[in-house]
Amino acid sequence: MLTCLSRRVLVGLFSIGILPLNAMASGSWVADDIGITQSVRGVAISAKPLQSPVALAQDNARIVSISWRYQLMSAAPDGLQVKLCTPTRCMPLEGGSGLSRGLAGEAAATQLTFIYFIAGKGRVNPPLQVINHQVIVNYR
């Protein structure tokens, strides 16, 4: 009885538009890793790619949004630029944490790579030390 009632409630919510039809196909995955150390300006350093820790149930799942976070050992050096990239495109990150739809439409099972770049030439003192970085990928 409860199962039948639950099914009727869900069908009703779908039919009046309170729940989108693809609401049950949504999901998210989280991945994190230790960061990088960078001591030279003008050189882009890619961190180890992050990917879904388990195979996704849907092969055609697409990214809706991504939350990111990276932690630095000390203050960010002048000229620091950080991007989050798939194999086909990148989005610049504004600050150490946030939420973006900049990679929406990409395959949800794709690898994501943090790329760190410090504009200019010469050594960075103290070196940039990224303690860790994390992504939360929301997909549908």
Swiss-Prot record:
Cited Pfam families: FlhE
Please list which residues make up the signal peptide. Answer: 1-25
**Could you tell me which InterPro entries the record lists for this protein?**
FlhE
Q: Which domain of life is it from?
A: Bacteria
NAD recorded as keyword: no
Give the organism's phylogenetic lineage. Answer: Bacteria, Pseudomonadati, Pseudomonadota, Gammaproteobacteria, Enterobacterales
| Gene that this polypeptide is encoded by | flhE
Q: Any one Gene Ontology biological process term?
A: bacterial-type flagellum organization
UniProt function note: Not essential for flagellar formation and function.
Q: Which organism is it from?
A: Yersinia enterocolitica
Q: Which UniProt keywords apply?
A: Bacterial flagellum biogenesis, Signal
Question: What name appears for this protein in its UniProt entry?
Answer: Flagellar protein FlhE
